[in-house]
């Protein structure tokens, strides 16, 4: 049976000693968000979360949620609605899907149903009402993964990896997972770890990205660190500017025209700083939507997540490392594996001129 073949919950991490019920709820909620950020769909819960995140109508109807689950994750059984009696016994049951939906909405307060449906379910909570005014059930999404660098270097940089259609997060994650299985490569993807011994693996990841080139982009912004004493605050400002200008670029180029919803996933730093920076970034992006985009940009979420299990933030790290190498190491002209990776990465997405002479709309580079 499908709901037995796929784990319902996954292996739960060990609870800290003396953990309270509320602390467990917060920890489990963050685990759900971390797995969503990495497009991990190994369990029934992962899959329910992934669908509810991208399709608003599934938050109100368990039947709609179940049908989308079958269509996306069990297509060989669902067969476009031509369900046989044998298949019906194997498809993930409505009760299983509904139980996960209820936990996600009621316990974690994520992807809440409309107020009308919450009222019918007896779960309407004014303190946790979701901002739904600007949401459109059929609105496309832009997903941005962000990394930062330069706190001890000459320049502060923020690099971002953009997926212009949220369904492509699942497709690319499937590509990467299949590559990991085929190659046995289980390590994190970090530019600093590139060596002659593993360079070919990094170049294989680059090939996967090139194959998805019509649905992704990269954007970076930099400013000298000298004169900017509060580096964390400057990096927060840079993240806002690279996203705000990136939205303008994608809209004007026609690659991702508005209206769109926006999800931002940034590499987690210190918890206290993250809470403030995430809240500030969301408010600034919402203000930018009203002032510059005629409210055609709906800021769905801004979340700090652990990058150690997130391939997409690690891809942002590869891009940022390549740019850094190009800018500060003689345009990556050496023979070191990092030079070769930087040249290959920038040539693939910028053209032969590197970051200084970008030949397409897939990369933007700005200095402040």
Regions found by a protein language model. Name each.
Residues 2-143, 148-368:
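Phosphate-ester processing/binding pockets and catalytic centers
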């Amino acid at each position: 049976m499908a709901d037995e073949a796929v784990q319902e919950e996954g292996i739960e991490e060990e609870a800290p000693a003396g953990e309270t019920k509320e602390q467990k709820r917060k920890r489990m909620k963050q685990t759900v968000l971390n797995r969503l950020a990495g497009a991990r769909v190994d369990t029934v819960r992962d899959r329910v979360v992934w669908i509810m995140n991208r399709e608003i109508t599934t938050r109100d109807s368990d039947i709609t949620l179940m049908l989308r689950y079958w269509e996306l994750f069990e297509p060989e059984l669902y067969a476009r609605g031509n369900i046989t009696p044998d298949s019906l016994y194997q498809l993930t049951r409505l009760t299983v899907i509904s139980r996960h939906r209820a936990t996600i909405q009621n316990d974690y307060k994520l992807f809440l149903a409309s107020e009308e449906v919450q009222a019918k379910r007896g779960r309407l909570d004014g303190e946790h009402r979701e901002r739904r005014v600007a949401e459109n059930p059929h609105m496309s999404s832009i997903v941005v993964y962000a990394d930062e660098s330069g706190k001890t270097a000459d320049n502060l940089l923020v690099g971002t990896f953009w997926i212009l259609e949220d369904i492509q997060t699942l497709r690319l994650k499937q590509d990467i997972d299949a590559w990991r299985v085929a190659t046995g490569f289980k390590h994190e993807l970090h530019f600093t770890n590139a060596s002659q011994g593993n360079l070919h693996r990094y170049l294989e990841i680059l090939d996967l990205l090139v194959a998805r080139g019509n649905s992704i982009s990269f954007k970076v912004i930099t400013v000298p660190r000298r004169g900017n004493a509060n580096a964390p605050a400057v990096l927060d400002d840079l993240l806002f500017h690279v996203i705000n200008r990136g939205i303008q670029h994608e809209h004007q180029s026609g690659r991702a025209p508005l209206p769109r919803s926006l999800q931002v996933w940034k590499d987690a730093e210190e918890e206290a700083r993250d809470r403030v920076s995430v809240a500030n970034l969301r408010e600034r992006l919402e203000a930018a939507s009203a002032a510059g985009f005629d409210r055609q940009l709906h800021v769905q979420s801004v979340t700090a997540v652990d990058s150690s299990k997130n391939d997409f933030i690690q891809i942002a790290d590869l891009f940022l490392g390549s740019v850094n190498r190009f800018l500060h190491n003689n345009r990556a002209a050496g023979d070191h594996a990092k030079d070769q990776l930087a040249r290959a990465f920038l040539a693939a997405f910028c053209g032969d001129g590197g970051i200084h002479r970008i030949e397409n709309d897939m990369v933007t580079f700005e200095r402040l």
